[in-house]
Amino acid sequence: MLIDPQCIYSVRALQQLQSYVESGRLQVSVIPVSVLDPEDGGQSTRSALALLSRPAGELVSAWQAGNVTGTPSPDAPDRLRANLAIAEAIHLQGTPTFIWRKPDGTEGRLDGIPTSVEELVASVGS
């Protein structure tokens, strides 16, 4: 799940999926990018850098708690550049964007908030 930490749609999408994640039906990897800088005066980059400075196991909980401030770690800019390279490679249109491998081996993709969380979870399979 590619997200912009300042994107309300990314927040809502994760909230929709939370019960599936907690029940073990779905595993979500959150990849912070910064695409809203022109609209938020650079806050997206600052927030993404703060999240990427956290240990991997704390990134999502920090984002959910709105804890997206702090001094970036030395490797955070490189991690953000790598995430932005992923975004460019997949021609990211906005956030959230979901990419997954379907049970039949094909790629699944959803740009935006899922209209049917059940369909998304079923498409991901196990």
List the predicted regions and their residue ranges.
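Short, charged/polar low-complexity linear motifs in solvent-exposed/disordered segments
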Residues: Q27-V28, D78, G125-S126
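Structural alpha/beta surface segment adjacent to cysteine/selenocysteine redox centers
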Residues: M1-S73, E88, Q93
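Non-catalytic, surface beta->alpha helical segment in thiol-disulfide oxidoreductase systems
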Residues: I99-S126
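Alpha-helical scaffold elements lining the catalytic groove of polysaccharide deacetylases
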Residues: G70-R79, N83
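C-terminal structured interaction module
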Residues: N83-I99
